[in-house]
Amino acid sequence: MEKQAVITATDLCIGYRTHKGEKKVHEHLSFGLYPGELTSLLGANGAGKSTLLRTLSASQPSLAGDLQLLGKPLQQYSEKERSRTIGVVLTDKTQAGGLTVYELVALGRQPHTGFFGRLHPKDHLIIKEALDAVGIAHKAESYTAELSDGERQKVMIAKALVQECPLIILDEPTAFLDVVSRIEIMTLLHQLAVEQNKAILLSTHDIEQALVLSDKLWL
């Protein structure tokens, strides 16, 4: 059976709208992201990687073209619907150093429980499974400020996992990491894509690991 894309773009144009008009970064882009696949986006700084990721996560609108998420135009999704469909992990280091690992990951359940939502047994099970999946369960009660950069990245991936989204987008997830941690994170993401049947898209400068561990490369 042919796999159905989680998100598809047809003749997509990305860029910015300013008071001087439109500034196109890339145009005529057509592609799909599929469940069970890790796709790596490669390119130099300023090549438009972050612009594409922001467009796909609905953080900024496209300039033209069609963008479909699970067969529905992306712009028709409410913020709550998007948060249940697209998980986003940014490069910026988390400022939630006063939270434990468990507490931070639990915030990823907000799309299902609401901002002040109470966690039910099912939520706690999902959180535990995510911590186990990324190999950070033993740090559940540690404060995030005490973690290494690689451990913090695992926590943010776990936070995205508990959103139960079919699509996860990561902006430079291996930035600031040493070689061993970069390999570990890339291996983990490929494993999660396959085992949890998720479409995962990441931007990276790590060409060697992307070549080895990605199912698809976008240049």
Predicted segments with their positions:
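Conserved structural motif at the start of ABC-family nucleotide-binding domains
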Residues: 7, 26-28
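The feature captures the beta-strand-to-loop junction immediately N-terminal to the Walker
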Residues: 42-44
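Helix-to-loop junction immediately C-terminal to a conserved catalytic motif
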Residues: 57
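Conserved ABC transporter NBD signature motif
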Residues: 65-73, 82
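Conserved ABC ATPase "signature" region
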Residues: 106, 121-139, 164
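Conserved ABC ATPase signature
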Residues: 143-147
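Catalytic Walker B motif of ABC-type/P-loop ATPase nucleotide-binding domains
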Residues: 168-171
